[in-house]
Amino acid sequence: MKKIFLKIVLLLILANVGLGDVAQIIGDYYSIDKGKVYYRNKILEGVNPKTAELIGFSLLKDDKNVYYMGKKIKDVKIKNFEKLGQNYWKNENKIYYRDKKIENADIMSFKVLNEDYAKDKNHVYSGNEVIDPSPLLGKIKNPETFEFLPNGIIYATLYGKDKYNIYYINNTMLNCFDSYYFIYEVKGINKDKVEVLNKWFIKDDKNIYFKGEILESADYNTFEVLPNGDGKDKNRSYEYLPKDEWRWF
């Protein structure tokens, strides 16, 4: 009886949907159905279904244009297109993050770090914006050699290194619309032995650091990070650290 029921269901499906009518899901709300490319339930007029492909988050290209969230990106015509990584792409010697052009990016040294960060010989980028626009916010000494530490991207907190330094980088909201990256060199740390413990604590082979500053009172051998993110050693727990317990070299 069960087999007969399944056969009836299958026949009903085939009767209502031809084999050639099954929609092809591209991803991120893009699909192809009956020779048309769709974003959600809207037909994207003029998109070539034979060359349409997803190249990043909600980014679609065919042989002529690039689309973001179903809208054609203005002033972009496919010429010498190259996908650089998830969300980053190059066209006509210009580099883009999603639908935004990265102004003044150095094409020869540009390298994607992950889906939201990239670098060239001059800057590190978050999306299409540099993270170090002003020396007042801190600078990465050698962006071309910059890389994130393992487990070094934790929400708005970043840990990275170049050939000179280890960096603690914090993205801080200044108001409802603006945020800035504050970049701090972690002074005195052994950059070949550094380990990220969580967004607040890192360590090397000798010391524990809190938000990029050495934690003088911590007992290195017994220090551990608790499940709630706080620190603890044999002497005390570290739920809140006043400024006088930090030390800059």
Name each model-derived stretch.
Residues 1-21:
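Classical Sec-dependent N-terminal signal peptides that target proteins to the secretory pathway
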Residues 19-249:
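Non-catalytic tandem-repeat scaffold regions and their flanking low-complexity/translocation tails
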